[in-house]
């Protein structure tokens, strides 16, 4: 049956029995396709019936359906004609793991950063009203913790103040809400959604209040009783107090019930919340039995067992986790904070070992940063572990609440640089540019596991301001020993005997391995290269300027955007000291990169050892620092 679904219109003629069969097919399809590519499995298994109902009730794309977060949108993609593309999920030139307007007119927003869809919905509803499109509904599906983000409640406050047709579907796949009791609550919820209910209610208010002497008193008594019953029976007070209509909770795996609720909500033609309770990982035993996160996201797995088909080597995240636990065992002032991601950021083990010193604040990076500031004021040393891409949300708090007060808060940025398969919104290529403008901020970029352990310890010894440590996703690789340490800078390679000091190659973090490979290529062409790892990359260590005076060209190599990164900082530091040595940078272009593997993205922008060696050769030749173009070109090719 799934093969016959080319678009939402094909769902309209299906019977309830056929919809149930289709739901089973969709789950089987998801399990086998995501098992082969990796992706967000658990959340999508939980929204099958909900997504079917959404596309039967609303007219997408005429009625925008916005997913928050977008990793819940796999079934939506399937029902809008993209089943055939799932073999390429999260691969180069393939299907995105999030909604993508480049893929389909049914995808309005990319929505991989949580808690934003309601603000989009508010804006779209206003735009439709101003354009005279009064028959268009905007649907926001908010779930997987997105409602723990403050931006959602800012948007709800604005949506509630209008009469615009915004339908807010709360996909509750956790245990945040208690179940509603009995049929009376269901009756109240259904009644409140009837379009004529408000008219009748208003007439009743006027009639009771019009009774001489006791009318207002009677109305207030009746209203108080109604509110008390409502709050006792339904977990809706947080919405109704804002002025939003509410229905639910609805069994999210009963397609007929969900569809009925959505049709009532649509007919109301004003802001309404539909509370749908779903089970993450529904229908797949390995996910349902995963107590940690119901297989929220997985790599390539065996679809029968749910087990990974290969075991990765030691990763950056696990190395950080082990190091933090070791240090916390020696110091009771070390506390850890995460924004709803204890597993992905490596803090689950810390939570288990030190539960009283671990704080999961939900999807609330802004609160996380200022709460960390308060902890630091109280004598603790907080470690805030988040993905690099989510640092953007906490910039004001980091600048004004942490740095302004010179507080010892350590921010650990996982998934820095190019992450790859999750696409543009998850690449952590902005952090150095952001951190570089924060007064008093010190930033480390470890090149290997040994340096991560070392620099984490150094960060936790800082007591007069904030620190940050950034590292990428994936395996940590082999340790890269230094020849010597000059000041705070590790020297990894020097020109061979008899060669001149032509190029100072400044490698940021894990790009140290690439820098050494580039130096080998250049040595074969007679170009002498010194490779250094600054370790603490911002502010630029003094030793970099000293080393620069001995070379003819300085080149920085980093996986940050070219504007505002280490390259810009090194160039600025040399200008400040009036050191007249040319600087060049090999960095990421300042643009958004589509999903692909990390290696594919780096290759597409020329950040490979061969291409960088060719670039440096050209720069050296242009400066007249070494051999002629023709001889160099022959060696490069």
Swiss-Prot record:
Principal EC category: transferase
Entry cofactors: Mg(2+); thiamine diphosphate
A GO biological process held by the record: terpenoid biosynthetic process
SMART domains: Transket_pyr (SM00861)
EC number(s) recorded for this UniProt protein: 2.2.1.7
Cofactor: how and how many bound: Binds 1 Mg(2+) ion per subunit.
Keyword list, A-Z: Isoprene biosynthesis, Magnesium, Metal-binding, Thiamine biosynthesis, Thiamine pyrophosphate, Transferase
Top-rank taxon: Bacteria
Binding site for thiamine diphosphate: 71, 112-114, 145-146, 173, 284, 365
Catalytic activity: D-glyceraldehyde 3-phosphate + pyruvate + H(+) = 1-deoxy-D-xylulose 5-phosphate + CO2
This protein's GO CC annotations: cytosol
Residues at which Mg(2+) binds: 144, 173
Pathway(s) per entry: Metabolic intermediate biosynthesis; 1-deoxy-D-xylulose 5-phosphate biosynthesis; 1-deoxy-D-xylulose 5-phosphate from D-glyceraldehyde 3-phosphate and pyruvate: step 1/1
Pfam families: DXP_synthase_N, Transket_pyr, Transketolase_C
GO molecular function, a single term: magnesium ion binding
Record text on subunit structure and interactions: Homodimer.
Family label: Belongs to the transketolase family. DXPS subfamily.
General function of this protein: Catalyzes the acyloin condensation reaction between C atoms 2 and 3 of pyruvate and glyceraldehyde 3-phosphate to yield 1-deoxy-D-xylulose-5-phosphate (DXP).
Protein name as catalogued: 1-deoxy-D-xylulose-5-phosphate synthase
